[in-house]
Amino acid sequence: EYVKIIGNVIPRFANYIQDHMMLQRAPQRAIIWGFGEPSKLTTLQIKNKTYTTISRAELENDSGESIWFIVLDPISDEGPYDIHVTQKLANGSLFTISLHDVLFGDVWICSGQSNMQMAVTDIFNATKEINNAGKYPKIRVFTVASKLSHTPVEELLGITQNWSVASPQSIGGPSYTYMSAVCWLYGRMIHESLDGRPIGLIATSFSAAAIELWMPPEVVQDCGISLNNTILLPIYGQPVTWVNVSNSYVFNTMIYPFTRMVIYGTIWYQGEANGGYHTDKYACTFAKMIQYWRQTWNYRTGNLTDLYFPFGFVQLSTWSNTSTLIDAFTILRWHQTFDVGYVPNNVVPKVFMAVTLDLRDDPNSYHPRNKHDVAYRLSRSGLAVAYNQQVEFQGPIVSSVSYSNGSTTVNITYMAVQDIDLRNSNGFEVCCKGSKCHDDSLWVPATISSKNALTITLTLSSSCIGQSLFGLRYLWRTTPCPFKQALLYSYTDRNLPSPPYLKFF
């Protein structure tokens, strides 16, 4: 709430600029911003450095406030710092506001739907994780409340958890509130791998929100989606509602306010809501969303946020105990990689992922509780892509497939690992029925007949003899295997599975 003193609007910080927060460290430059009287000299002091600016002349709201913002020099010393902002009021007096216990580190946005919202208390080994949280005072956490708006808003409409130092209390909040398990575990693992570098984690998720609600309508339209469509959006505690896709309801409230803040990167766990909604457009909408977020952050922070900031995601897991089921999850996993099969790739730069289709849990839930494995895989790829660390971060990736017409075998060569860990013989299928292969019943298993270093040889079934091979696929099932029993893993890090694969000849 704004405050008036004898007719004066007093300065305040934007509502997510708080005590205990994390600001982006050097080499990037952080931004501090807030509201106050229009056209007033505003001074910021941090340690022995003083900055000045003039608040904007134009009003931002009906409260008579305008925006002020100050760009700090790059700060590599983690702190903690106290920050003081002083503004001259209309009556000539000075008014000072302060931030305390501010650290400088890497700021990560954690977004998506309910699998990102799923709290530490909801996962396996929650008690141990929560009890140990106090060992990480240099990790700071913040959770946004799920709100909607027709138009972009500068400030958050609701906050579930103010900036907090990691502790059993701040990490062990109620179910599906705070702290996001994937966000926390990813941040903790990055923090430990980077020798205790301070990490700020902003959890801003909206359960059941399709990807179309996370970007503006013109971007959705670029992918050939009609803006007359509506999306079912269940909001906890309220009747189920339909919202129009022509409004970026969730982006406006959950992401846009942070685009004035300099960040290091983003992680994303979403896709289930698109399992039956514009699934065929997901490769386009996902790529466009990443591009739009990056452009918006870069523009609104005056080029201080990297135009290609790292973007990590969790590839969809499982939900069924039926090993033969093939639903929209199978093709959506492929679309999550922009139809390449793996990331990083050349379609969208600096993107990384965690493969999770082997982490089967409760067959009736979309929310697997093995979030430690999810975060481990995501943090390994984050270290490699976002931090340029020389770590193994993915399972075997297909580099080439060789097949000659009339042959009874297919050779698949992999890259990125020293050797391949074969856990069983199930997972590959082929289709020899030409263009009719869109029918899943026409695909038949192909067995591994030999392995030589990084090359696997498949023997085709008798139904393919004398016919041309049309398609090859791997792990093309909603739930392709028991827990951690997919066919292919890295031999040197056996918690890194090979992702699903699809090829047409």
Where are these regions (language model features)?
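Cell-envelope and extracellular/periplasmic
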Residues: 2-505
